[in-house]
Design a protein with these regions (language model features):
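Membrane-interface transmembrane-helix boundary segments in multi-pass integral membrane proteins
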Residues: 128-166
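Membrane-interface capping segments at transmembrane-helix boundaries
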Residues: 168-184
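Aromatic-anchored segments of alpha-helical transmembrane domains
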Residues: 1-5, 47-57, 117-129
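Hydrophobic cores of alpha-helical transmembrane segments in multi-pass inner/ER membrane proteins
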Residues: 22-32, 85-100, 154-171
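Membrane-proximal helix-loop-helix units in multi-pass membrane proteins
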Residues: 44, 48, 52-117
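Membrane-interface helix caps and helix-loop-helix hairpins in membrane proteins
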Residues: 5-13, 77-84
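Hydrophobic, lipid-facing residues on alpha-helical transmembrane segments of integral membrane proteins
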Residues: 47, 112-123, 156-168, 172
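Loop-to-helix transition at the N-terminal end of transmembrane alpha-helices
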Residues: 11-33, 37, 42
Length: 184
């Protein structure tokens, strides 16, 4: 886990409240414990966003343009290359999660744990060090939104992300595991 002390030094403590960084800690525990719950929990929160990260990174490498956004720091020459390379965990995480769920099975409670995690972590992100906009707690793409009052945005986030990301990802994982089990 070279990643954790390096990130702490370069990015600060608030960085560990990003779902992807929390996910690293949970995935490490999941690997150690071989826990379907931990992998399912993390998959519902990470699969979509880290897949989009990978698409943006590959798109930027291939075309020089960021198709989605979020990987611009990977091309920042002011940040040491070896620190940026540690962020490639975003690319490895989706296949690792899918492999673990294929191997261990999908726990149907995972999306609920991820929702609870969001309900705890995102308000912390909203109120603590708001200038970092961790997990987009104040607005998408690390920009504070101003269309609605901040607390309205926060409540919408805490309702819509579980409904539009976590639950559909859970349903996809249920479908995927049923399909893979039917083949064997």
């Amino acid at each position: 886990m070279v990643w954790a002390p390096v990130y702490w030094r370069h990015y600060g403590l608030q960085n560990f409240l990003f779902f992807c960084d929390l996910g690293n800690l949970f995935v490490t525990a999941g690997l150690w414990l071989e826990s379907p719950l931990i992998f399912s929990w993390q998959a519902t929160g990470l699969l979509l966003f880290q897949t989009l990260f990978t698409i943006d990174l590959v798109g930027a490498l291939a075309s020089g343009r960021h198709l989605i956004g979020g990987t611009e720091y990977m091309f920042d020459p002011h940040l040491a290359l070896w620190v940026r390379l540690l962020s490639l965990f975003h690319v490895v995480t989706p296949p690792l999660l899918l492999w673990a769920i294929w191997r261990l099975g999908h726990d149907r409670q995972g999306w609920k744990y991820q929702t609870l995690t969001a309900w705890i972590v995102v308000p912390i992100n909203y109120f603590w060090r708001p200038e970092f906009d961790v997990n987009w707690a104040r607005g998408p793409f690390f920009r504070e939104q101003r269309a609605v009052p901040g607390l309205v945005y926060l409540l919408a986030y805490l309702t819509l992300i579980p409904a539009l990301v976590y639950f559909p990802t859970h349903r996809f994982l249920v479908w995927l595991t049923q399909r893979s089990r039917a083949k064997f």
